[in-house]
Amino acid sequence: MDNILVNNKNKNLLDLNKEDIKKSCEIEDKIFHSKTVNDVDLNLNSKNDISSKMKFIMDVPVHLTIEVGTVKITIKDLLELRSKSILVLDKHAGDPLNILVNGYVIATGELVVTENKYGIRIINIIDNSVFKKL
């Protein structure tokens, strides 16, 4: 019969009883007392409930990227890049730019210059249904 390791003691599977399993779970719960989404009572019945329960995530920083274009090159070509090398991207001048949040495209926009700084004017939000629920 196979032996298993439970709480650093070798016990035969048949020797495990409900009390052993309960103790093991209690120890694991004390060590790993993190909660999963299922453990949290979201009770999202109204717009106010959602707002109050989601308030804590509103200050979480996200990484916003404006993608001018992409190019696929070999490692050999990458290693040969030098100052003044030019990479030809897959987009044309004037094409909408992708706006990504944490790597996911959420919108498109166009490049603008304001007060000698680059900016992006939002043209289209890809899917804002998540925001409408808040």
Curated annotation (Swiss-Prot):
GO terms for cellular component: bacterial-type flagellum basal body; plasma membrane. Keywords: Bacterial flagellum, Cell membrane, Chemotaxis, Flagellar rotation, Membrane. GO terms for biological process: bacterial-type flagellum-dependent cell motility; chemotaxis. Pfam families: FliMN_C. It is a peripheral membrane protein. Its main location: membrane. It is found in: Cell membrane; Bacterial flagellum basal body. One of its GO terms (molecular function) is cytoskeletal motor activity. It comes from the Bacteria. Signal peptide: none annotated. InterPro entries: FliN, FliN-like_C, FliN/MopA/SpaO, FliN_T3SS_HrcQb, SpoA-like_sf. FliN is one of three proteins (FliG, FliN, FliM) that form the rotor-mounted switch complex (C ring), located at the base of the basal body. This complex interacts with the CheY and CheZ chemotaxis proteins, in addition to contacting components of the motor that determine the direction of flagellar rotation. Belongs to the FliN/MopA/SpaO family. This is Flagellar motor switch protein FliN. The lineage of its organism: Bacteria, Pseudomonadati, Pseudomonadota, Gammaproteobacteria, Enterobacterales.
